[in-house]
Amino acid sequence: MTGESGAAAAPSITLNDEHTMPVLGLGVAELSDDETERAVSAALEIGCRLIDTAYAYGNEAAVGRAIAASGVAREELFVTTKLATPDQGFTRSQEACRASLDRLGLDYVDLYLIHWPAPPVGKYVDAWGGMIQSRGEGHARSIGVSNFTAENIENLIDLTFVTPAVNQIELHPLLNQDELRKANAQHTVVTQSYCPLALGRLLDNPTVTSIASEYVKTPAQVLLRWNLQLGNAVVVRSARPERIASNFDVFDFELAAEHMDALGGLNDGTRVREDPLTYAGT
C-alpha cells in the first residue's frame, strides 16, 4: 500500500492493470436518494475518494448529483458501479455500462464489476466479454467481479485470458474468506471487502469490544482496521456523516498480531448476504 495516512486520506493499492484504487471507500447499498446524496457529500468532504454504487441499488443518479455538486475534480475520484444480473450478456453488459454512465453523469467509471456470478443464469462469461469491450472503449478504466468464487474467476481467465482487477466479496471476522483471498492473490486479483461490520452483528461482540477498548477506538474502527491489515481493500456503508468520518479515521493505529488472530478466530462461516453458489438475483 502506498499513500499518506490521515483521518480520511486512504492509501491506494495498485491493481493488476496498473491503475490505483483507494483501499477504503464509501458504499451506498440500500440508501435512499436523499441518504445517498448526503452520505456521498459528507464522505467527499472529509477526503474519501472511492464511491461504490450499483445499478441494483437504484441510486447511481444520486451519486452523480453529489459528485457534481462537490466540486471535487473527476481525476481525484474513484467511482465503482456494477452490472445487474438481468443485464448479463455480451451486448447487454455494454449497453448497461453506458446507461450507468448516463445516470452517473460521467464519461467513465473507474471500476465496473459483475455484481453476482449467478451460476443458474449461466451468462457471466459472456458478460465479462462485453465488459472487456467496455474497457477497450474507455467506458471503464478497470473491470472486475463481485461475489465470485475461485472457480468462477478461473473460468473467466481460462475462457477470455483477461483477469479481473478486483473481486469484491462479503468479508468480516465471521466470514474471513481465507481460502478465497489466497486464490485471489494467486491471480493478482485484489480482494475488496463489503459488509465489513457484518451488518452491525459484530459491533457488540465481546472480543471486538474488548480490543476496541484497548486501543480507545470504536468497534467499527477495529473491524475495519482488521480487514485493512489483512491486505484487503474495503467498502463500508453508512448514511450518517459522523459515522462516515469515524469509519475513515483508521489509519493512525495498527492492531497487534494477537488481536488480529483473535478477530480472525471468530470465523464460523456466517454470511449476512446471499450465497454466491446459488443466488441468481440482483
UniProtKB/Swiss-Prot annotation:
The lineage of its organism: Bacteria, Bacillati, Actinomycetota, Actinomycetes, Mycobacteriales. CDD domains: AKR_AKR5H1. Transmembrane segments: none annotated. The active site is at Y57 (proton donor). NADPH binds at L197, L199, V235, R237, S238, A239, R243, S246, N247, R273. Belongs to the aldo/keto reductase family. Inhibited by the antituberculosis drug isoniazid (INH). PROSITE patterns: ALDOKETO_REDUCTASE_2 (PS00062). It comes from Mycobacterium tuberculosis (strain ATCC 25618 / H37Rv). Gene3D superfamilies: NADP-dependent oxidoreductase domain (3.20.20.100). One of its GO terms (cellular component) is peptidoglycan-based cell wall. Keywords: NADP, Oxidoreductase. Identified as a multidrug-resistant tuberculosis (MDRTB) immunogenic protein. InterPro entries: AKR, Aldo/ket_reductase_CS, NADP_OxRdtase_dom, NADP_OxRdtase_dom_sf. Its EC number is 1.1.1.-. One of its GO terms (molecular function) is aldose reductase (NADPH) activity. Catalyzes the NADPH-dependent reduction of dicarbonyls. Exhibits narrow substrate specificity, with preferential activity against the dicarbonyl substrates methylglyoxal and phenylglyoxal. May play an important role in the detoxification of methylglyoxal. Monomer. This is Aldo-keto reductase Rv2971.
